[in-house]
Amino acid sequence: MKKLLASCAAMAMALTLTGCGSSGSGDREFEGQELHLYNWGEYMGENLIADFEEQTGAKVVVDYFDSNEQMYIKVANGEAYDVLVPSDYMIERLIQEDLLQPLDKSKLSNLDLLSEDVMGLEYDPENEYSIPYFWGTVGIVYDKNKVSEEDLQAEGYNIFLDTKYKGDIYLYDSERDSFMMALKALGYSMNTSDADEIQAAYEWLLDMNNTMNPTYVTDEVIDGMANGNKDIAIVYSGDATYVQSENEDMSYWMPKEGTNLWYDAMVVPKNAQNPLLAQEFINYTLTYEAALGNSEYVGYSSPNEEVMLELSGEEGMYGAYEAYIPRSGYEKDEVFQDNPILKKKIAELWIKVKASKG
């Protein structure tokens, strides 16, 4: 589950993954070439790299990052990769700073396999620079035996102010996710730059922090909820899918106030050393076989429409888990934008929120 478990995988050294069973023949188009991939940890199917190497004759060298910001620093400082897998708002920033090269759509024959829901988004409306890799939502995982669905329906994010759940909640140790929750609870855009709205969200978080005794976690939320240690938590959809698969008492709720609808996508940096091989890799990941292996292993929603429908069907691996299918078309859901003013302000305020907890 990328969004949290990546922090563990990123501690490892860069890995070189070489396919097994290659005949070593020289008739493959990219025989002997190298692809340098920079991705989140725990974010690829187990056979994705080996199968691509077998098919192309190339060798894939993978580095892992645990945040978009960590990735950005290396790319902005000139470190060369062929493929990156950043999130929506970071793609917007990379485009604005002219750090990406346009894709050659003639090399991407599998684009028609993708769901319309993942294409033509605001950060790259023509998909000139990015091709979707995974997508999902942020929502509430809760114990159906202990948390009332009526409370969730009536209160939405304000359930985190409901004192009957005091001491039984997990929250991400993340200013971005926490302020998203607070801003949405108050009816504001999570992309606001309005000082009064940001201040109101800060005060909401202070109130929650001082009355609800939340437990702030990172990857611990996954096993914690799977083990039933708390009753309610803010969780990314792929992690929620895992929690539900491990504990049948857990369910997933997307509040009526709206949430973060997020997208991670593949891009080619401007200084890529092998852009042709990069686009071959991107096109390969869109195939049914590659997309199926990715989504089965990671648990996040595939951009490949056939894969998503198969895995979410009655007989599918994730058919019983509502977290697997993102809510699309809901007007109050938003994609994070690159907003330096908001980012700087909430980082400062988050330190104060955490310091206020007794």
Stretches found by the model and what they are:
Residues 15-19:
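C-terminal motif of bacterial Sec signal peptides marking the signal peptidase cleavage site
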Residues 21-23:
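Bacterial signal peptide processing site
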Residues 26-97:
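Early extracytoplasmic/lumenal segment of secretory-pathway proteins
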Residues 38, 80-226:
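Extracytoplasmic ligand-binding site segments that recognize negatively charged/polar headgroups
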Residues 90-93, 226-227, 232-249:
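A ligand-binding cleft/hinge motif common to bilobed small-molecule-binding domains
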Residues 199-207, 246-270:
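Periplasmic-binding protein-like
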Residues 264, 269-330:
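Mature extracytoplasmic/periplasmic domains
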Residues 326-358:
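Conserved C-terminal helix/tail region of periplasmic/extracytoplasmic solute-binding proteins
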